Amino acid sequence: MFHLAPDIINLNNVTFSYKGSKRKALDDVSISVKKGECIAILGPTGAGKSTLACIMNGTIPCFIDGNLTGQVNVDGLVPHEAGTAQMASRVGLVFGDPDTQLFGMTVEEDVAFGPSNLGLEYREIMKRVKKAMADMRLTGLERRPPHRLSGGQKQATAIAGVCAMLPKIMVLDEPTSMLDPEGKARVFSIVRMLKEELGATVILIEQEVDDILGLADRVFVMNSGKFMLSGTPREVFSQTDELRNAGVRVPHVVEFGGLIGADVIPFTIDEVLETVKSGSWSRPAKPAESDDARNSSSGESLASHNDSEPIIKVRSVEFKYPSGAKALDGIDLEITRGDFVAIVGQNGAGKTTLTRHFNGLLRPTSGEIEIMGRSAIGVPTIELCSHVGYVFQNPDEQLFCTTVEEELGFGPANIGMDKSMISSRVEAILNDIGLSKYRDVWPKYLTKGERQRLALASVVAMDPEVLIVDEPTTGLDWIESCQILDYLEDLRAKHGKTIIIITHDMNIVSLYARRVVVMARGKVMGDGTPQEVFSQPDLMALACLRRPSIADVTDALWGEILLTPADAAQRLFSGKTTHVEV
């Protein structure tokens, strides 16, 4: 006789408001999760996803105060009554910001901390640590202090530390937001292993919708503290309008199926190819809505973008940290004025290290850098910063004023801008970024997306010719991500700014970048348009990158790299024959 697995998580009519806030972060939420299930929770920033995660292991309200009502039962315990110490052995929680849970002197010490507190023998602890570090590509970094890791390596360390505890329940709150595409794939592979081999229950809070299709048993979509949609991946992702309204990006294969009027919406690349091969589609009379109406669909070569003069020149640059580790190895690069460049590559490839040389935050061990035709050697950082603005990956690292308005005026005042000009620039930028109503608000009270916009705007206020943004979309939902990138593109197209982004998001690269610089092991390994880079599988593998799924589809169908589902649908409607039998 078949028996259903018992519920391991039960939340009934749970409502929560943070201390001092009248807004309900969770509003009458109920959910049951069976042992061994993988549940994906999607939704915009501020929907209540992280609040839900913290309630499951007792962090709320044990450490984060507020008003909690309703019933919560996790593995037979009430988390806030059992306490976080007892819950930690049952529920492993990985936060989206790794700095909140890294505190060891070395990577190995950090990964070993959790299993060491389970009373295990030393040999078992080190066995788990070694495996977890290997799974997360951290082998060789055992003795490195966590503060000297890249953002992605920090995130990998936090995940490894929780995995080493082998908890019954894994709650992963945007665990891949800082990881390169191969790192993301490894995390999802580990999730699958935990579920299938160890019987673990997994709660996965994510923005990476393409990977969820084949991983989650059920999907829940949250908005404004409530569940708006729930069901199997096919049931949920078929409701494309509702997903867009909730700030969730529709997977490329699903969007393409809708655009071509597929008889049955495909959910894998193989299903897309079979749909096209069998002719199980008909061009809709009214075109379906597309998420990717921006791009750059052309197949222009890089040469067509190189008419402007270089604004940044890098010649034979090497950089070594005080430890002797070489982070940059013979870099030669030119960035032309008015370009939109994405610098991509695996975690630790040297992307951030390179770009911090452009405004003097770092100085090369050897080699030369020219900014606007002038050698950067000996030029004070404050002078370079007036020409090359830098937005850090974590906005909280550069927000420190007491109000939003003061934050926007700080940089311009520092570089000697006239008071009347500062006032007019601040007013204009407040309107541009949609933060006028928050002018007198303390920045820490803003959402992550609002803080990201403020950090960007505080640099834009200084009117630099070059703007570097390190991971502009980390922790943001799809709507917020596009708002940030649309703003950057507007600065380039209308004001002639040169934009450089560092990103792991190939969907963002395909939509916005005119040029892609690929780094690996401290070197520039490739340079071209998105189409040119995505058409080089060896280069993509070397840099631990994965192209958007629609590029895989169009490559298989026509031997072409197209960047959006809309482009692919138009190509199909053109009636040209397929490249291969599918």
Q: For the regions a protein language model found, what residue spans apply to each?
A:
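The feature captures the beta-strand-to-loop junction immediately N-terminal to the Walker
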Residues: 42-44, 344-346
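Helix-to-loop junction immediately C-terminal to a conserved catalytic motif
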Residues: 57, 359
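Conserved ABC transporter NBD signature motif
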Residues: 65-77, 367-375, 384
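Conserved ABC ATPase "signature" region
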Residues: 123-141, 420-438
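Conserved ABC ATPase signature
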Residues: 145-149, 153, 442-446, 450
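Catalytic Walker B motif of ABC-type/P-loop ATPase nucleotide-binding domains
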Residues: 170-173, 467-470
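Conserved ABC ATPase "signature" C-loop
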Residues: 224-225, 521-522
